[in-house]
Amino acid sequence: MRAVLTRVKSASVTIDGEVVGKIGKGFLILLGVGPNDTEKECRYLAEKALGLRIFEDENGKMNLGLDAIGGEVLVVSQFTLYGNCRKGRRPSFTDAAGPELGNALYEKFLADCAALGYPPQHGRFGADMKVESINDGPVTLILDTDQLMNEPRR
């Protein structure tokens, strides 16, 4: 499972001209699901992402988490995070989970976020969405459970 997490001042997602999710200060999480992902990866990634302390304290040090700043979460499904650009000029997306598994684990990730105390605003799996955000910093992190859960700490 892969996530691109951005610290934002605000973010929203629009489908067919209607804003379906909107947040103030917090995290915009673009979420991609791989074919071997399970509910275990969902929970791990939700805990890791929502626990990050990447907001600045009074000394300008990244030391505060969502809870300390009253932050919100917007999650948008993004199968293109599994795009393979090794050959040619058009990406292949065969490394992404199929729609059934992708949607199930996307919904599970949303539920895990809510269970951790951060009920997310969100887009709709498989929809054509317009995402707007005002980045804060910018601070953007790439989280990949294949690396986070399986590699020894350096």
Question: Where in this protein do the model-derived segments appear?
Answer:
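Active-site pocket-lining segment
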Residues: 71-80
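C-terminal edge-of-domain segments
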Residues: 131-144
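Compact, glycine-rich, soluble single-domain proteins
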Residues: 18-70, 83-111, 115-116, 121
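N-terminal intrinsically disordered, cationic/polar leader segments
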Residues: 5-14, 18, 33
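Short, charged, intrinsically disordered terminal tails
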Residues: 144-154
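Divalent-metal-activated hydrolytic enzyme cores
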Residues: 114-129, 134
